[in-house]
Amino acid sequence: MRKKYRDKFTNPEIVKRIKQIENSPQMQSKLHSVKNGMKNNIINPFVIVIGAIFVFIALRAMLDIYSLLVMAAIVYFWNKYSKQRRNELAKSYIDNFLLAVLKEILPDTTIDYFKKIDLKVMKRLVPDSQYYFGNCHIVFGDDYKTEFSNMEAFTETEDSEGHTRQTIDFCGQVLMAKFDTKINGHIRVVPIKKGKVLGLRNHGNYGKKTKIEKGIETESIEFNNSYAIYSTDDFYTRLILDPKIIELLNDWKEKMRVCLYMNEQYISVSFESNAFLFALPQTKKQVDELSLSTEYEKVREKLSGFYSLIDIIGEKL
């Protein structure tokens, strides 16, 4: 019997408990101290601009090899200093806000802010992009070791004048759970964009049907108009994608584009939210606005939906 986790993210008592912890005098005192420390690591953009102008004027007056050496040294040490401040800011944010919340729900959760989920997972969800960037890699303390990451996928093209243009194909979140599905090959459920390309369904960079895949339709007209199923395993596709999964995916499409990829080893979902979650605060005002319960709400709905998906699939296998 597989353990189910969906209720952990729909239970109002957990939200209530997090707010109680946050509002306790001890936690308020701790958060006040933490926020003051984080503010010390915020670099004022105005100071950066003034400093850059001053250095430029001073070096321009010299215009010799020594000025170039000084400029190189300044850039090197400034980058090193900025990176150190950013790392300290990230550690404070992770330890005192993200982990403080997530460990209340799944105690063994870990976070590496400057890493991303496995590149293969990203490529299989958005296969027609060229480059992939991500951050905030979270490994949740559940039986599946569910992984989370922000993700951006983009392509680069060159115009007739030789100028490079970057196009963002996807911006949002990716979730992946290791799961022995018994699938022979893989199953892809990709969103359909409005309009057709050369008379064919437009999937954007989610990838069209390949030669080894078979297109499968469901009894839901709403689903068939919003998603395409491409699979190498007809039996498990029809077994897994039952009315509960269809309903769940239909609900998601009202909020954002969602893509599902499954193979014999894992289940993954991408949410095209057009924004990164858990961005580091850039100003002192943003630091003041940080809240345990607010950080939890940012990811709660996506985790609830993802664990619902896993629970339903687990019942079938």
What is each model feature region?
Residues 29-37, 60-63, 84, 88:
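Membrane-helix interfacial "entry" motifs
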Residues 99, 103-155, 161-317:
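Charged, low-complexity intrinsically disordered regions
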